[in-house]
Structures are given as C-alpha cells and as structure tokens.
C-alpha cells in the first residue's frame, strides 16, 4: 500500500496526463480479436491470451513441444483494449450502435433539450472550458412508439444488440478443442437455465420474460451491448463519482477507463459535487459500458442539499436531463414508503442508503407518501421513451449484521416487486437492488425472497458484507457474500473497495475492488456450472503444473501483480523457467515431485508391460513366429 499522498493539484495533473497519453493497450501476451455476427457491423470484442508450448520430450538439443491453445476471455475494455484503435477522449468513442438505432426508425432527434436545467447549463458561457465539445443531439421515441429492448423482445424481434450479447456470452469457447481445457464439473444452479450454447433467440426470450435486461439508452450509442440476468455470466458494477470535497472531471474519466480495463461490466456515476452534469457528459461519451446513476443525488444538489425542498418537478427535470445525455439505468428509491420508515427505528444503524435516507426525510417532513412511488408511472413513461432501465433501489437495506433480513428490508422488497409489474406494463426493463450487510447463513433467503417477490427480475446486490469488523478490508468481507449470492442467482454484484465506510476510493482502490469482485463473480459462475467457465482455470492449472510461469502470469486476472510477487524473490529470467518457486524451493516443490511420480509410474507401467509381454512370449514357446490360431 502506497504511503505517498498527492496534493489535489498533483492528483488532477496526474489524471490529465493519463487522459492525454491514453492509447489502446493490450494485456501482456494478449491480443484483441473480434467475433463477427450475421451482419458485418456486429463485431464482438474479446481478449485472446496467447500461451507458450509445452515441453513434452526430446533431447537437450532437439526438444519436442506441444502447442497450447490460446484462451479467449470476456473483455469489457472496449476500444481501450485494442492497440489498433486511436483514442481521443476529447472526441469520445465511436458510436457503435448508432446504425442499429437509426435502422429501427422509431426514434427522432429533438429540436431542443427537454430539461430546463440542461438548457441553462448550455447557455452558461462560463462552463465552456469544462464542457465536452462534441455534444450529441438527443433522440427519443417517436409518438406512439416503444423503443426498449424489452418491447422488441416481446414482439419477437431479435435485435443486433441481442445477437452481439449471445456471441459475447459464449466467450469464444467454440474455439477451444482441448478436452483438458473443456472439462468442467457439474454445477449447482439453484434453478437457473444455463444452455450449452447461448443463442440470440435465448437472449430475446430471457429479456422478454423480464429475467434479464440490456441497459442500452438510445443516447449512449458508444456502449457495447451487455446483459444482466441470472442465466448469464455474473456481472460486476464499479462505482465512481466526485463528491463535494474531492475529485475532478479528469479523475473520474480516468477511473472510468481504469474500471473498464479491470473488468467493470457497468459503471455507476455517483457524483454529488460540482459540475455533475459536465462530468457525466465526459463519462458517457467515453464509456464502452452502460452507465447508471442515482438521479435523486443531483436533484438534491438542485435544491441546495435540503431534502425537504425536493419536488417531483425538479426530479422529473433531472430524469429528462440524464436520459437525454445517455444514462443507461436509473436507481430509483420508490419503495421507501412512509409506513415503512418507523420500522427502521429499532435498527442498530437505521437507514444507511443515501437515497433511502433522503426519501425517508422527505416523507416525514411532509407526512406524505414518497413522490417517487406516487409518480412511478410517469417515471416509467420517461424511461420508455429513451430505453433507460430501472434499478429499483433498496433504500431500506441493512447497514449492519444486526439489522439483516428485518421487516423493513423485506417490506420494501415486496413493494419493489409490485413496481416491477408496473414498469413492465410500459415495456421498461427492471432489475432489483439488494443488500447490504448479511451474515453468510442468512444470504440465501435474500435471493429466494427476491425471485418470489420480484417475479425473477435480475437481482443486483452490494456485496453483501458478511461481517462488520474489518474496515479497510471490506472488499474481502463483501467478496465472500458476493460469491455466495452470485452462486444462488444474483445477476450483478456491485463492488466494494477497501475504502468502504472510510473514504472516496482512488484509482488503486477501484482496481482492488474490481479484482475482488471479478473473483467472486467467476467463482459463482463455476459453482453454477456456467458452460465454459472452467476453461481459464484449467489452462492456469495446466500451466502451473508444467511450470510455464509466463502463461501463469498472463492467465491471471491481474498479470502485473502475479509477476511482481513472483519476481520479489526470483527476479532473474532463469526464475521464469525454473521448475519451482520460492515458497518450497527446488527440492520440496509438490508439483515437481508429482511430475517425477507420474514419470516414475509411467516408466513402471512400461516395465510391467514389457515383463508381461516377455512372460507371454515364453509361455507360447519362445517362437518368433506363431501360427495364426496360436497368436
């Protein structure tokens, strides 16, 4: 852990340098490949890890090798992971989905922004130096049209986004021929449907049933289609965002790019400080992954942070502002009802959700029902016009182990189920947010309750944290719970960084949180028996047994840390071919001994086989040639 503390000026300068020098970068010994679909512009990016051959015999001067197949893996880095792509943050990413959106001919460009706040910001010349220059003209659905992926799916339409996702979810495993790599243990899926091959039709069917969502606002054409659902790979979200006391636009864009490099499937911008609107524009125009927000945070800024002064009109304007910028999903705390707030009074830690506490305070101060609940149908109409997915927030999630699985938590969950059915009336895609702090033996009930109460809509959880005693290590405490609930059926895991409960995460914290949660998600995929999930594990184990150190580094989720730890004790190049590591040394390496045992056993088998043949030869009279009937 670094002890160097940079000043705010130094942090911004460092982030600006990162952006100015940004270029497409591949991981060590990996290359970007594209798998094409039925039409030429469906090109699905993947990372292919190149492996070295295995020494199988021969002499010192004439060694014999066997090639090892390259291993394709899911890649969230977008153009940032392709060395052939020129990156210019000032211009933003290419608009991958624009031709698909235009071809559907069910949306139209707006003459002006619908949000009064957006118009006000655009008219402010003082913001010119902060503003992203290549602003898009926003689009929305034509009158009488539904333009959501859920609507298309229900109409039996397989969109290019769905085909893109089907290819992506298969992770190129059809390229793998080795039986050793393809071997997989049967999983326990807890009722999930996991087909051997994911087809575009399967994607369409899951979306139509509401079991999966494709967050894809028509005003975010730069995003690469992805899916969140129980019957697909477990996804990971990373949170970024400035606050009133720290971080800048440059730093948030840097965190975005960094997040996609380390495996974030979606990113939530939770900014609460100055220039929220401008920061979000820079993030969206440079994001290859879906972007989510909590609109109540910005609405609160518009009323100077006074929760009691919030109004539906201010919130509605914020929804329009963000939808026309391209936000792919909104967290809406519409399940925090007035009658549920007293249930939290006996809790140890009360209401810990920022959005939940804001709405609870508003309800109590006005003694009225939550205006998000009261205006929920209008929220759905807005979302349907841009294809913004809803992430129904758990404003009453438990903030401590003691408060887990209480009446307030599950009362809200049941209300979220009712709201889900309303959203589906408008063809709006929905996922459900979950806890929180839950001990291990109480986690599965959360998944069971969600499936039953929310009609199998995808579950999206923060952890859960399995103990409260480890500030500074809550990426571990929550990673345990995340792996478990992912196995039970949770569709997306919201990462927790080492700074949870302590401060705003920096770039290194983001990486630590993501690596922890990629481990949890992958462990869940293995346990569920997701087809092809074990390929990378098998490739790693084979490389480990064969002392192919470079391949071990490159197959790792974090090749740089794996290499650095190895080189702390064996830095010489000879250490990269040694048949041992510094843990056991050359004489006590279990894998080296296992290889010797295997070689010895093979030699013994040959010797025994030769002895058997010799005895058989003598038993038949010792003749070199036998009559046919004697052979």
UniProtKB/Swiss-Prot annotation:
List of residues binding substrate: 239, 268, 297, 333, 353-355, 394-397, 433, 460
Entry annotated with the keyword Ribosomal protein: no
UniProt keyword Iron-sulfur present: yes
GO biological process entries: thiamine biosynthetic process; thiamine diphosphate biosynthetic process
Record note on cofactor: Binds 1 [4Fe-4S] cluster per subunit. The cluster is coordinated with 3 cysteines and an exchangeable S-adenosyl-L-methionine.
Catalytic activity reported: 5-amino-1-(5-phospho-beta-D-ribosyl)imidazole + S-adenosyl-L-methionine = 4-amino-2-methyl-5-(phosphooxymethyl)pyrimidine + CO + 5'-deoxyadenosine + formate + L-methionine + 3 H(+)
Pfam families in UniProt: ThiC-associated, ThiC_Rad_SAM
Transmembrane segments: none
Name this polypeptide is given: Phosphomethylpyrimidine synthase
Chain's gene name: thiC
């Amino acid at each position: 852990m670094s002890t160097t503390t940079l000043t705010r000026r130094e942090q911004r300068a460092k982030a600006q340098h990162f952006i100015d020098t940004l270029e497409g970068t591949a991981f060590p010994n990996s290359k970007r490949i594209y798998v094409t679909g039925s039409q030429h512009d469906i090109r699905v990016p993947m990372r292919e890890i190149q492996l070295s051959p295995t020494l199988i015999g021969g002499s010192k001067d004439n060694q014999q090798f066997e090639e090892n197949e390259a291993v394709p893996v899911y890649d969230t880095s977008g153009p940032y992971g392709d060395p052939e792509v020129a990156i210019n943050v000032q211009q933003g990413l290419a608009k991958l989905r624009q031709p698909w959106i235009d071809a559907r001919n069910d949306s139209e460009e707006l003459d002006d922004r619908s949000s009064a706040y957006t118009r006000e910001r655009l008219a402010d010349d003082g913001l010119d130096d902060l503003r992203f220059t290549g602003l898009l003209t926003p689009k929305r659905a034509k009158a009488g049209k539904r333009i959501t992926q859920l609507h298309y799916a229900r109409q039996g339409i397989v969109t290019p986004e769905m085909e893109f996702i089907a290819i992506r979810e298969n992770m190129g495993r059809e390229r793998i021929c080795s039986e050793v790599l393809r071997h997989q243990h049967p999983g326990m899926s807890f009722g999930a449907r996991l087909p051997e091959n994911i087809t575009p039709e399967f994607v369409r069917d899951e979306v139509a049933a509401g079991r999966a969502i494709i967050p894809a606002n028509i005003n975010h054409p730069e995003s690469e289609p992805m899916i969140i659902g129980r019957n697909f790979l477990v996804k990971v979200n990373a949170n970024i965002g400035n606050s009133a006391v720290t971080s800048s636009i440059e730093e948030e864009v840097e965190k975005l790019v960094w997040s996609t490099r380390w495996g974030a499937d979606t990113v939530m911008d939770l900014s609460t400080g100055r220039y929220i609107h401008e920061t979000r524009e820079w993030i969206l125009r440079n994001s290859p992954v879906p972007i989510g927000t909590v609109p109540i945070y910005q609405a609160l800024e518009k009323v100077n942070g006074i929760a009691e002064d919030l109004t539906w009109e201010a919130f509605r304007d914020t929804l329009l502002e963000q939808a026309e910028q391209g936000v792919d999903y909104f967290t809406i705390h519409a399940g925090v009802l007035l009658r549920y707030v007293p249930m939290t009074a006996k809790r140890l830690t009360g209401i810990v959700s920022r959005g939940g506490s804001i709405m609870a305070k508003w309800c109590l101060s006005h003694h009225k029902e939550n205006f998000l609940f009261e205006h929920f149908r209008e929220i759905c109409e807005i979302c349907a016009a841009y294809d913004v997915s809803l992430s129904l927030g758990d404003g009453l999630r438990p903030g401590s182990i003691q408060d887990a699985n209480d009446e307030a938590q599950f009362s809200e969950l049941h209300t979220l189920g009712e709201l889900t059915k309303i959203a589906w009336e408008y063809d709006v895609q929905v996922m459900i947010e979950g806890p929180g702090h839950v001990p291990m033996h109480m986690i599965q009930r959360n998944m069971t309750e969600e499936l039953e109460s929310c009609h199998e809509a995808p579950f999206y959880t923060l952890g859960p944290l399995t103990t409260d005693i480890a500030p500074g290590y809550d990426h571990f405490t929550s990673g345990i719970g995340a792996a478990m609930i992912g196995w039970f059926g949770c569709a997306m895991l919201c990462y927790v960084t080492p700074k949870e409960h302590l401060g705003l995460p920096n770039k290194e914290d983001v990486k630590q949180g993501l690596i922890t949660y990629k481990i949890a998600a992958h462990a869940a995929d293995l346990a569920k028996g997701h087809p092809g999930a074990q390929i990378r594990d098998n490739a790693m184990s084979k490389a480990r047994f064969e002392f192919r150190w470079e391949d071990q580094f490159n197959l790792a989720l974090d090749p740089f840390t794996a290499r650095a730890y190895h080189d702390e004790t064996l830095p010489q190049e000879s250490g990269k071919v040694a048949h041992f590591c510094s843990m056991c040394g050359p004489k006590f390496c279990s894998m080296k001994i296992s290889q010797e045992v295997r070689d010895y056993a093979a030699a013994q088998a040959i010797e025994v086989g030769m002895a058997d043949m010799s005895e058989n030869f003598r038993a038949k009279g010792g003749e070199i040639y036998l009559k046919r009937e004697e052979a």
